[in-house]
Design a protein with these regions (language model features):
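Acidic donor-binding loop of glycosyltransferase active sites
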Residues: 149-163
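Carbohydrate-associated surface elements
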Residues: 23, 45
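Nucleotide-activated donor-binding/catalytic signature segment of Leloir-type glycosyltransferases, i.e.
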Residues: 115-142
Length: 168
């Protein structure tokens, strides 16, 4: 992620490349001698057995402190500036509807909950919004479907072009 991998030397080993997005394909081809017709895209797929429509998990909504009339916006991902969470909170601060709540699922480092200077800034920004913002920290992948189901809206405020857009 964020590294260039194409090279004419590697192109002699194989006759094509499979990329997860146009962005990855185009980035690879910038440093490659492969013809564009030899670069295929296979977009990320969704496991429809895990991520399928189902009633929202009311027990989880309640445990997280959301009322029945709350409109829950979900951000799920790594907590870093490029992901645009701070901009999402700015937008939330401009919405005069108190029952719009933001649930932030994720951490600065994949796979573990750990502090970072950016997370501390987000927590400070969230204080100004009172109880409208809630952080869960890292949530294991197998538990994520319930978090998506409890949300009324999923937000992906990324500020840079994503290589694969795993969350969306």
């Amino acid at each position: 992620h964020g590294q260039t991998s194409g090279s004419p030397a590697m192109d002699t080993i194989y006759g094509g490349v499979l990329a997860l997005s146009e962005f990855i394909r185009d980035d690879y081809l910038q440093n490659s001698s492969l013809d564009r017709r030899s670069a295929y895209i296979l977009y990320n797929c969704i496991d429809t057995e895990r991520f399928r429509p189902a009633p929202p998990p009311m027990a989880l909504r309640t445990r997280l402190g959301f009322g029945p009339r709350d409109f829950v916006m979900l951000f799920c991902g790594r907590l870093e500036p490029d992901k645009g969470i701070h901009k999402l909170m700015e937008a939330l601060s401009k919405l005069p509807v108190p029952n719009i709540r933001l649930l932030i699922v994720g951490s600065p480092f994949f796979g573990r909950t750990q502090q970072s200077s950016f997370l501390r800034k987000l927590e400070q920004q969230a204080k100004a919004l009172g109880d409208r913002v809630q952080f869960t920290g890292y949530i294991p992948n197998e538990d994520l479907p319930d978090y998506y189901r409890l949300a009324d809206l999923v937000c992906v405020p990324t500020l840079v072009e994503e290589a694969a857009g795993l969350v969306a």
